[in-house]
């Protein structure tokens, strides 16, 4: 996976004022130029990212200029025991996507995918 663009820990901040021309409504195009937010959701373009994240309880930044490697649509109370390990940016191994996504959501976007598979052991 390509490294995230911008500050490793927090992603890239976007100046959303350039898309919010009227003060209350965004004028977004349908152009497909995907970006991945620190909430691990893919947005169709930077303008849509701004429109859909403006009212989040915590600030969302752009993790990378492309689709997300792992999509984390929502928190899950129950995770399966499937073993498909993912290595988090915190150096911890997560047994599967569900456990990784729950950690991402708890971290409020601070955690991102370092790589598929286990982290290197010391």
From Swiss-Prot:
Cross-referenced InterPro entries: Bifunctional_prot_inhibitor (IPR051597), Kazal_dom (IPR002350), Kazal_dom_sf (IPR036058), Prot_inh_Kazal-m (IPR001239)
Reactive bond 2 for elastase (site feature) positions: 81-82
Residue ranges occupied by any Kazal-like domain in the UniProt entry: 10-70, 71-121
Coiled coil segments of this chain: none
Location in the cell: Secreted
Keyword Protein biosynthesis assigned: no
Site annotation Reactive bond 1 for trypsin: residues: 30-31
Gene3D superfamilies hit by this protein: 3.30.60.30
GO MF term list: serine-type endopeptidase inhibitor activity
Keywords noted in UniProt: Disulfide bond, Protease inhibitor, Repeat, Secreted, Serine protease inhibitor
Disulfide bond entries: 16-50, 28-47, 36-68, 72-101, 79-98, 87-119
Signal sequence interval, chain numbering: none
GO annotations of cellular component type: extracellular region
Function of the protein: This inhibitor is composed of two homologous actively inhibiting halves: one which inhibits trypsin, the other which inhibits elastase.
Full protein name: Double-headed protease inhibitor, submandibular gland
């Amino acid at each position: 996976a390509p490294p995230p663009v911008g500050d490793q820990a927090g992603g890239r901040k976007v100046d959303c004022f350039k898309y919010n021309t009227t003060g209350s409504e965004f004028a977004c195009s349908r152009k497909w130029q995907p970006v991945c937010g620190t909430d691990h959701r893919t947005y169709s373009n930077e303008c849509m990212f701004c429109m859909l994240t403006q009212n989040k309880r915590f600030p969302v930044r752009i993790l990378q200029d492309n689709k997300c490697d792992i999509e984390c649509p929502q928190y899950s109370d129950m995770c399966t025991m499937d073993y498909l390990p993912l290595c988090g940016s915190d150096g911890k191994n997560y047994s599967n996507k569900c456990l990784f996504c729950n950690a991402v959501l708890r971290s409020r976007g601070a955690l991102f995918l370092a790589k598929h598979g286990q982290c290197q052991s010391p």
